[in-house]
């Protein structure tokens, strides 16, 4: 068995060494704590006894075979689903009973496996949608276009352009979101999530559909986001090269249960992980 591998269409292939993540102080209080989290659908345990801690500036990976429960975990964290049992702490604050909107205000933002932009709106307006959870004017002031409204709109424009410039997208501000190339749409969705000022950013298969060049750019951008904004990032991804290169901690799910946690090297050499992806091999097999 090779000491390092990535999973690629059911085969173990050599994985190049040289991860790009530096040693980091992950902070005293975790950004996220999941404690015995679970949810059942009609008696089926989609996620069972899920516990995980993510440091304040950690890039963490959540991996597993298709149907393992990864996106369900994201839906629990963002309150699309309310857990059947367990606790979620964001920066030490219990999110129990909170709505999708409330946990976003608390500091959890996400992107989706399938891009969900407002295609007929401009790039800038897509980003400003995320800024509206920070509105400081009333509906009355907005309807009458009072000075408070214009002050906020000016600040929102400046913030949107600042965020777009970080990803070299400011020149696209007036373009329709739906007209952008695929990779740029992915970046825009991440920028919009960042506009909500999150403490934890959840990325659901951010490299899906990307070519190798776009994936390499994405990897650099994820590290850039962590270093620029000082936030925690948790990602679901099937591109194991991406995961193994940038994630400090990796959690592996199978059939809704955690089967392994650890560093890239530990996960790559974990028998339970290999079996989950590739199936159990008889001792006599080569």
Locations of regions flagged by a protein language model:
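Glycine-rich phosphate-binding loops of nucleotide-dependent enzymes
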Residues: 2-286
């Amino acid at each position: 068995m090779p000491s390092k591998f990535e999973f690629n269409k059911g085969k173990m292939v050599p994985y190049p060494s040289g991860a790009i993540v530096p040693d980091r102080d992950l902070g005293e209080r975790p950004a996220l704590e999941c404690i015995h989290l679970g949810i059942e659908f009609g008696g089926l345990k989609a996620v069972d006894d899920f516990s995980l801690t993510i440091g304040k500036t950690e890039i963490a990976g959540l991996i597993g075979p298709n149907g393992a429960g990864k996106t369900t975990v994201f839906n629990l964290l963002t309150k699309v689903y309310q857990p059947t049992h367990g606790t979620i702490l964001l920066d030490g604050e219990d999110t129990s009973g909170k709505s999708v909107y409330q946990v976003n205000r608390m500091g959890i933002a996400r992107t989706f496996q399938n891009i969900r932009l407002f295609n007929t709106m401009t790039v800038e307006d897509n980003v400003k949608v995320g800024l509206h959870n920070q509105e400081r004017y009333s509906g009355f002031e907005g309807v009458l276009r009072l000075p408070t409204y214009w002050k906020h709109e000016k600040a929102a424009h400046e913030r949107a352009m600042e965020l777009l410039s970080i990803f070299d997208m400011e020149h696209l501000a007036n373009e329709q979101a739906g007209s952008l190339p695929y990779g740029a749409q992915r970046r825009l969705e991440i920028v919009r999530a960042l506009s909500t000022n999150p403490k934890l950013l959840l990325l659901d298969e951010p490299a899906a559909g990307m070519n190798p060049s776009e994936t390499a750019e994405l990897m650099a951008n994820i590290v850039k986001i962590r270093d620029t904004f000082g936030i925690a990032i948790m990602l679901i991804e099937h591109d194991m090269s991406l995961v193994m290169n940038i994630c400090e901690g990796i959690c592996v799910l199978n059939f809704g249960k955690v089967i392994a946690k650890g560093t890239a090297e530990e996960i790559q050499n974990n028998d339970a992980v290999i079996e989950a992806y590739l199936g159990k091999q008889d001792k006599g097999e080569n």
